């Protein structure tokens, strides 16, 4: 959302202008209502706020709040309440084969909105339903919440459960995981590896 403009939606990869227009004050109030006091303080320090919201019906949204031209703006992505399967995503069978491997490193890369998080979630959920492993996720924010099946799953959110990706990864080595999902590769994380 941008101030003094219509609200835009991205549908199937295309930006669509909606009929909804918000005043500066409405936009500010709406965005501030989503932020904790700590997140508001970080915004006023010039930092972005990246977090997930969950509605009472279990639907989740990923929210990024930022300033532009001295005003608040937000990008809000709707997330599926249920983790899709690899087959529902029409992903190649090689991803299931990789998820079956007992060891290795899998990097999923691509631009914003290309399905990286959803692909990783489908792979983690596949492992969850096929093996008795300990899965540890480190995310900012947690996007998909898994229901444990055969695996034990611990989901750690940066800024809420741990201070940083690097700290969480250091701790993870003592938590006996079989699978670690790291939601982002940041420079500080690359330095500790």
Predicted ranges, named:
Residues 82-87, 156-160, 182:
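Short, flexible loop segments at the rims of nucleotide/cofactor-binding pockets, characterized by
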Residues 87-90, 137, 160-164, 186-189:
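Short secondary-structure boundary/capping elements
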């Amino acid at each position: 959302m941008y101030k003094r403009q219509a609200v835009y939606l991205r549908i199937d990869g295309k930006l669509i202008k909606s009929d909804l227009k918000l005043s500066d004050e409405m936009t500010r109030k709406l965005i501030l209502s989503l932020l904790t006091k700590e997140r508001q303080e970080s915004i006023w320090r010039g930092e972005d706020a990246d977090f997930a919201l969950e509605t009472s019906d279990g639907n989740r949204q990923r929210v990024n709040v930022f300033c532009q031209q001295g005003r608040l703006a937000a990008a809000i992505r709707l997330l599926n309440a249920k983790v899709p399967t690899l087959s529902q995503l029409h992903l190649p069978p090689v991803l299931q084969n990789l998820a079956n491997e007992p060891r290795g490193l899998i990097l999923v890369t691509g631009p914003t909105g290309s399905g990286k998080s959803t692909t990783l979630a489908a792979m983690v959920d596949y492992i969850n339903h096929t093996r008795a492993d300990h899965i540890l996720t480190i995310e900012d924010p947690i996007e998909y919440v898994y229901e444990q099946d055969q695996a034990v799953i611990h989901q750690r959110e940066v800024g809420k459960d741990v201070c940083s990706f690097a700290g969480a990864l250091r701790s993870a080595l003592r938590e006996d995981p079989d699978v670690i999902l790291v939601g982002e590769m940041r420079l500080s994380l690359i330095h500790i590896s």
